[in-house]
């Protein structure tokens, strides 16, 4: 899910991953105890500049929450050109779909700079939610909201591109 980097400025460090989870759109409705349980299943990872974190078409099993740094998200076009579709900053997340389905990644994510992230693996995530229905409901509701927002953004982009394509045909 993307948001303006103004919510947390890129590169700003927090005391611990619970602070970042609390500010994340996926986890902002959780109690302190629930946040601590989610943080406990996460693993902090670091990535150097230009490191590929996830690759389009690879099978995924992790969600990443950006704790420090920024990343670019891109798709590879038929011409093999990389088309950057988004930039994500501190507090943003990616890979959440991998926690729900067992499908290939839809895009590649590369570190724009040295990054620190909290990685949550699907198996650990599923075990946590199986133990607590109320927590599962809160998190799945947030996932649905995040995915709906992405669908809206994608629809807006599609309409814009289609409109631009129609406009170019009129000019020609």
Where are these regions (language model features)?
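Cytosolic regulatory regions built on CNB/CRP/Popeye-like sensor folds
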Residues: 1-172
